[in-house]
Design a protein with these regions (language model features):
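Non-heme di-metal
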Residues: 1-270
């Protein structure tokens, strides 16, 4: 099982909340009210890992390997919520447990392979965002936290990539669906950012007091459109590997989708 190897790799790389985060060194005076506001929203958004895990266990019910991995993913993602909450508490913020159920969502069932692809792309993008936030955060401990979370998200993306490789190896006809979802996810803008927490109807972010906070932060800390190129490169690298074709741009990806569709139709008819 892929899970066996991932368990060891992730355990080896895992950071410790009690020893690796310098909570005693936090200087709340360096944070503006806006940073506190946005950080609180990021913290609450991370709580959505609970709802995503429920979705994964439901939609991948027969896939023991993947569901086993999701148990690790859930633990690490909920630690993201916890470290941000503990940070905010050190800055004088409080969280009322009664407010949390209002954020709960049940995601509608969807094609499992598309969900898997969406989350691979989403982890790549969130790592990119957190890396930018780590460079702009005004408080040193917070900069370190964002850097740590970004590294986690990249590791999670690599784990999803392993399951996408397995899917194509076991069922090659699923490749066009993977490519189409990747193309859709690549086409993201600051004003309409694509991440699993923003694209459902309603979305996780829709449940928040300030549902536009991600767009605002991106326009402040990642202005323009060129900043997405590293995300595109990483997504296209995996799609190139799965397709066995060099894909250097979204247009290349679109052309590959068009080329594969007739083959899939013929295979299905046969």
């Amino acid at each position: 099982m892929i899970y066996d190897d991932l368990f060891i790799r992730l355990e080896r790389a895992r950071w410790q909340l009690s020893t690796d985060i310098a909570f005693d060194a936090i200087d709340p005076s360096l944070l503006s009210k806006q940073w506190i506001h946005d950080l609180r929203h990021i913290c609450l958004t991370e709580l959505s890992a609970l709802y995503a895990t429920e979705m994964f266990i439901r939609d991948f019910y027969a896939d023991i390997d993947f569901c086993s991995f999701i148990s690790i993913w859930f633990y690490e993602e909920m630690k993201h919520h916890l470290v941000l909450r503990k940070y905010l508490e050190r800055c004088g913020e409080t969280f009322d447990e009664a407010e949390l159920p209002s954020l709960r969502l049940t995601f509608a069932p969807g094609p499992a392979i598309e969900t898997l692809t969406m989350h691979f792309c989403g982890e790549q993008r969130l790592a990119h965002w957190y890396t930018a936030f780590s460079k702009h955060a005004p408080e040193p401990v917070l900069r370190g936290i964002f850097k740590t979370l970004a590294a986690d998200e990249l590791r999670h993306a690599a784990c999803y990539a392993k399951y996408l490789r397995r899917a194509v190896a076991n069922k090659p006809e699923c490749l066009p669906d993977i490519l189409k979802m990747s193309l859709w996810m690549i086409r993201s803008t600051n004003d309409a950012p694509k991440h699993p927490t923003t694209i459902t109807e309603p979305s996780v972010c829709d449940q928040l007091e300030d549902p536009e906070y991600i767009s605002r932060m991106l326009n402040w800390y990642l202005p323009g459109r060129d900043h997405e190129k590293p995300v595109q490169r990483r997504i296209l690298a995996l799609m190139s590997e799965l397709s066995e074709v060099n894909l250097e741009s979204p247009r290349d990806l679109l052309n590959q989708i068009r080329e594969l569709q007739p083959r899939v139709a013929v295979t299905s008819a046969a």
